[in-house]
Amino acid sequence: MACFIEINDSSDERLADYVQLRDVNLRRSLEAQHGLFIAEGAKIIRRAGEAGYQPRSFLLAPRWIDGLRDILDAVDVPVYVVSEALAEQITGFHVHRGALASMRRETRWQMADLMDADRLVVCEDIVDHTNVGAIIRCAAGLGWDGVLLAPRAADPLYRRAVKTSMGTVFSLPWARMEDWRGGLDELKERGFTVVAICLLYTSPSPRDQRGS
């Protein structure tokens, strides 16, 4: 069972996982260093747990405890209980859904794991986290088999990407390409037809590429 700890001081060192969640550069270094990502909202927390990700801790406003009681009863990690005002002070934004979890980051797929797929979405240098999350959500909804990300593309496990994806980052396979050009060549060698999206009226339809 989780250990509930009421906290009233935003400088408490135990809250380090949740500090300044809107500071992208800070979060990028902190999350990589400590091997974590942040799940925001009860639904996202549940989906992360259902996908097998393990929590490090929780940061909750009191009114969200009962809704997550079954999850909290099943884990042995600290639950930091704070007021909603203090949560905003800690994280740097208003936590609308009042529930955050620090989860253990895992690398679940490599590019080689996706090479038997039929259809893959490839993200070239898409650096906006919400765009990456939206692409993964759309790919999952449209029945694509996975997503490959160029080396410079945004982190799918960054908080805003996870939130925008509605948790589909936990279920749809995705992997990062170590080398952009080499990765495209490998896709072609494995029999994939690589089609780039270009928003010009003169661009051919993907349908025109079928069978080519």
Regions found by a protein language model. Name each.
Residues 1-62:
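Boundary-proximal intrinsically disordered activation/regulatory segments immediately upstream
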Residues 50, 106-200:
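RNA substrate-binding interface of SAM-dependent RNA methyltransferases
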Residues 67-76:
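Short, aromatic/basic amphipathic alpha-helical patches
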Residues 78-81:
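A glycine-rich helix N-cap at a beta->alpha junction
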Residues 88:
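Glycine/small-residue-rich loop that forms an oxyanion/phosphate-binding "nest" at active or ligand-binding sites
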Residues 101:
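Glycine-rich phosphate-binding loops that contact phosphosugars or nucleotide phosphates
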Residues 201-212:
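Single conserved hydrophobic/aromatic residue that forms the stacking wall/gate
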